[in-house]
Amino acid sequence: MSEQSTPPNEIIIADDGSDHSTKQIIDCFSKSEKIPVKHIWQEDQGFRLAGIRNKAIRNTDCDYLIFVDGDVILHRDFVKDHIDERKEGRFITGSRVLLSEDETKRRLVTEDWKFRGLNYPAKNKLNGIRSCFLSRVFSKNNSGIYNVRGCNMSFWKSDLQEVNGFDEQFTGWGREDSDITLRMLNCSKTKLKLKFKAIQYHLFHNERERDAVSKNDRILNETISQNRKKAVIGLI
């Protein structure tokens, strides 16, 4: 993060139940990082992304929050792009480049995190083009709630508090990002689908089990039918 052209004020690592070896890595990282690092942990009780995100939100005084996953590499202007595009009453969703399995292995071995042009094996490589001109043309406000990437989102903390954060009814993989998007829209917030800026590269890995999608779809459908604005189980 210290290599970002606009570094964040702090880094919060939201840890959903990792063991002590992860804490040792984070402690080592914290000592080498110039930016303050907070390690927020919760007990392993299955996939509880909404819960650990809420715990992280409670543990920061920053007024604008950028969410990323632990399996992505950030363009050096990633933070800058989110900050430059923030506006009152707006939240931002971005895209990602999906690196191939072989390319992911190569990068992990060589520790080469610089991406030059589009000469690397990946899906959605157009998402790796950073252009302020193209971004102005193709970035649009929209009301879509699906295909939202929680690994590339940003919000005002006050807006997250208004919708009571992420809904911890969602456990297992899926739909918590669609749910908070819908509740933000129900509270008259604007969603910016940011293109050709806020670039990130997703490392290949096997997908998580998706056996909770049907349950989570039912919760999302309740949010839709009830025009829900606040999380049922959220920040407070």
Locate each region found by the language model:
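Conserved donor NDP-sugar-binding/catalytic core segment of glycosyltransferases
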Residues: 77-118
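Short aromatic/hydrophobic "clamp" motif used to bind/position activated sugar donors
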Residues: 65
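Short, flexible, basic/aromatic active-site loop/helix in glycosyltransferases
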Residues: 112-145
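Acidic donor-binding segment of Leloir-type glycosyltransferases
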Residues: 1-46
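The conserved acidic donor/metal-binding loop of glycosyltransferases
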Residues: 69-73
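Active-site donor/metal-binding and catalytic loop motifs
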Residues: 99, 194-211
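Glycine-rich, basic loop-to-helix element that forms the pyrophosphate-binding segment
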Residues: 43-60, 77
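A short, conserved alpha-helix in the catalytic core of glycosyltransferases
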Residues: 147-148, 152-164, 170-190, 195-196
